[in-house]
Design a protein with these regions (language model features):
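Non-catalytic, topology-defining segments of multipass membrane proteins
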Residues: 1-140, 152, 182-224
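Residue-level detector of transmembrane insertion/anchoring sites
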Residues: 62, 66, 144, 165-168
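Alpha-helical membrane-embedded segments
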Residues: 144-151
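Interfacial helix-loop-helix junctions of multi-pass membrane proteins
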Residues: 157-170
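Short, membrane-exposed interhelical loops at transmembrane-helix boundaries
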Residues: 170-176
């Protein structure tokens, strides 16, 4: 997936019908509002009704969060950057991720929209329940919190400079993924798997192109 030009204004039109187009957008707070009850409610249900211990709940919750980072990496690398031959597959990949490379300043498409997000969440929870049984009531909330942290980190990378020095590699890794090489730097919430699988940028050698980085940042509202 290669895009020769970054569009700095507006957003991609994914569907002709305005109702469908609206369903492709999401505000971060809406997504957090949808999933916070799940993150809190499922472990409470498991503790009160399934008699899972606090230690077990905590362990599977943390494992779920950590598993998200691997899931994020694999999806980004092998699904969202898959070189498809069919037009339908190309369109699907563009809807899922390609439009973000084309319009990196689009704030409304950094999180998956509510409806497809809920459908996918139900399917993922069902699969995790089949594999993990009642442990999924802790694993899935951890997995979802990992997703919310990923989405929020992605938003922050395009909105602000890194607030702490130790976070700068995350920012630079993602910026370089956009403007230098789309086949590296797949981790957004973590660079661990880029380092494990050899797709990490050498940040000591790569010079930061401030002009290109600025093209990736959300436009700041001008105060009149």
């Amino acid at each position: 997936m290669k895009f020769e030009k970054i569009h700095n204004k507006g957003q991609a039109q994914l569907f002709r019908h305005p109702a469908l187009e609206m369903l492709t957008k999401a505000h971060p707070l809406v997504i957090w509002g949808m999933y916070l009850p799940v993150i809190i409610g499922l472990p409470l249900y498991a503790a009160m009704n399934l008699h899972l211990t606090a230690l077990r709940l905590t362990a599977f919750f943390i494992i779920g969060m950590l598993f998200w980072t691997l899931f994020e990496y694999l999806m980004h690398r092998f699904a969202f950057h898959y070189i498809a031959e069919s037009k339908r597959a190309q369109k699907f990949i563009y809807i899922m991720h390609g439009n973000h490379h084309h319009y990196p300043r689009d704030k409304e498409r950094l999180f998956m929209p509510p409806l497809p997000s809920l459908i996918l969440a139900i399917l993922i929870f069902g699969l995790q329940f089949l594999l993990l049984g009642n442990n999924s009531f802790a694993f899935f909330p951890g997995f979802v919190l990992g997703y919310l942290m990923y989405g929020s980190m992605h938003y922050a990378i395009h909105a602000w400079n890194p607030p702490f020095k130790w976070m700068k590699p995350l920012w630079r890794n993602h910026h370089l993924h956009h403007y230098k090489d789309e086949e590296r730097g797949f981790g957004v919430s973590s660079t661990i798997w880029d380092q494990v699988f050899g797709t990490m940028f050498d940040l000591k050698k790569e010079k930061e192109d401030k002009a290109k980085v600025q093209e990736l940042m959300f436009e700041k509202k001008k105060i009149s």
